[in-house]
C-alpha cells in the first residue's frame, strides 16, 4: 500500500497537493501545525477541507514554541502585513524563520510512524516569494539529513516546485478542484478566505495566476502537463 503524508495548511498550494495525493496514493495522511499563527482561521479551514476531501487521518500538531522564537508579521499582531510590492528586495516580514525546517522534520517523523513513503509539501521556487526555505536546494538537503538521522528512505515530494501560479491553478483544475480551491482555501496573509484581501503579496500572486490561467487555459495546461508528466 502506498502511503503519503501531506503538510496541510488549508491554503491554495497544500490543498492542490492534497487533491493530487488522494489520486496517487492509497492512504493519505494530513498534518497541520498550530504555531500560534496570526490567523487561527487557517486551522479551521484546514480541518474543514480535509473532511470535505475525505481524509481519514488528519493530525493536528501543537508547535506554538515556534511563535516564541520566530518573529514575523504572521506570528505577531503588532507587525503589519505589507501590501504587495512587485520589486521588493530581501526577505519579507511574512517569513517565519525555521517554519519549513520544523514542519518537514515533524512530518517525516509522523511518516516514519505511519509507514508512509513520502512527505508532500506545496513549496514552490518558480514564483519565488523570497522565502529561503521554499527552495529546491533546501528541501533536498533537509531530506538527505532527515533520512540519515532516521535511517529511513522517506521522499520529500514538491509537486509545485517548478510550477508558476497559473500552472498551479491548472493542476487544481486537472483534479477537478478549481472552484474548491478558489472559494474555500485560505492563502491571504490578512486571514480572508477565498479571493482574500486583494492587497497582500499572497493575494496578488494568487489572483494574477488565476487571471493568467483563465485567459490562456490551453497553453497553461500544456505547460503544466509538460512539467508534471500528467497526461
Swiss-Prot record:
| Protein keywords | ATP-binding, Ligase, Metal-binding, Nucleotide-binding, Queuosine biosynthesis, Zinc
What residues does ATP bind to? 8-18
For this protein, the Enzyme Commission number is 6.3.4.20
> Which reaction is this enzyme known to catalyze?
7-carboxy-7-deazaguanine + NH4(+) + ATP = 7-cyano-7-deazaguanine + ADP + phosphate + H2O + H(+)
Q: In which pathway does it act?
A: Purine metabolism; 7-cyano-7-deazaguanine biosynthesis
An MF annotation (GO) of this entry: ligase activity, forming carbon-nitrogen bonds
Q: What Pfam family is a match for this entry? A: QueC
Is the keyword Cell division in the record?
no
Q: Name one GO biological process term.
A: queuosine biosynthetic process
Its top-level enzyme class, in one word, is ligase
Recite the UniProt cofactor note for this protein: Binds 1 zinc ion per subunit.
Cofactor dependence: Zn(2+)
Annotated Zn(2+) binding lies at: 188, 197, 200, 203
Gene3D superfamilies on file = HUPs
Where is the chain membrane-spanning?
none
Biological role: Catalyzes the ATP-dependent conversion of 7-carboxy-7-deazaguanine (CDG) to 7-cyano-7-deazaguanine (preQ(0)).
The family classification in the record reads: Belongs to the QueC family.
What name does this protein carry?
A: 7-cyano-7-deazaguanine synthase
Gene behind the chain = queC
